[in-house]
């Protein structure tokens, strides 16, 4: 990746919006020309104006050093300028809640910087895999040794999500080339299946052997039979996002473009919709507990919620860091809910115990954000990531 373009990409991930101040210029000072020229070659300077920020040059340097290798002189110039003019936005600090549960967070920086590492999963052999969306690659990590290997995928694929099958093959959603792909790690060969949907997004395997996926921009859901390549795609409500299989085989779909959760019949591909209170509600990820209750993060409202499929009843709880906390990735482990507050800096990992209705939370060490998806390991631990700083992480729950 071109170094200057990578700086742009990395800085843009720290921002909330770039629409309001699209033509504003950066403050005067040493380093302005470098940062301004680089940014304007890719996007408006408003993206930096809306940065969450850091108050020291060392913190800024730590962030972009996980994304790109610069000379000492370049790094010092950029870091000092950003620290002076874009200090920490302190209102975005998380409200961390103390508790009795102990965890250990281990993070690894992936080899190719600027790739936007995300969506780690555990393969049947215990290895950890991730997707490098911007670099069109996937990678394998040995959690015992820290050894990593990356595999190049078709250059236009920009894989959004990966999912392993029982044989250890790695399936991915080709978000930019309208494909579902499969990597055979033993040979490095890739098989692609073309989709009508332009942007396959998230995916999961069903006990029936089929792979089901969402396509956010295309507003479609799909089913692929890996045995024969048969592919069925259907239209759905706006911006389908996360997808999970429930205990009874029903597939549950989160919607990021409407205030709904969908129950997808794996055989007929028909969807039953459940409306979440408040038209502003948006759901990115969800999970199922042992009783079939659907847990979700209400990103726009700063809440987590529970849907009872039998009654349609929905109950929600305020996330500790408030309405702007933006709950994102979510998983259920032993009927306890784990999710992140992606609107805070550092990104906060939150534990919610439904039995006691109590919260506990921790700052993710690399902290830039954003954990966009999580995975429960066979040992009952949690795989996380920080896409803005190319980190893959393991949360050991004691």
Positions of predicted regions on the chain:
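Blade-level signature of beta-propeller repeat domains, shared across WD40, Kelch, NHL, RCC1
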Residues: 369-398
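Short loop/turn segments that connect beta-strands within beta-propeller blades
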Residues: 142-146, 184-188, 225-229, 265-269, ...
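Electrostatic cytochrome c docking/interface patches
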Residues: 18-34
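C-terminal capping alpha-helices of c-type cytochrome domains
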Residues: 69-94, 382
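Conserved beta-strand positions in repeat-built beta-propeller and related beta-rich domains
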Residues: 43, 129-134, 170-177, 211-218, ...
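Gly/Gly-Pro-rich "capping" loops immediately C-terminal to redox-active cysteine motifs
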Residues: 28, 32, 44-70, 149-152
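The canonical Cys-X-X-Cys-His
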Residues: 35-46, 78, 82
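Beta-rich, blade/repeat-based domains predominating
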Residues: 113-124, 155-167, 196-208, 237-248, ...
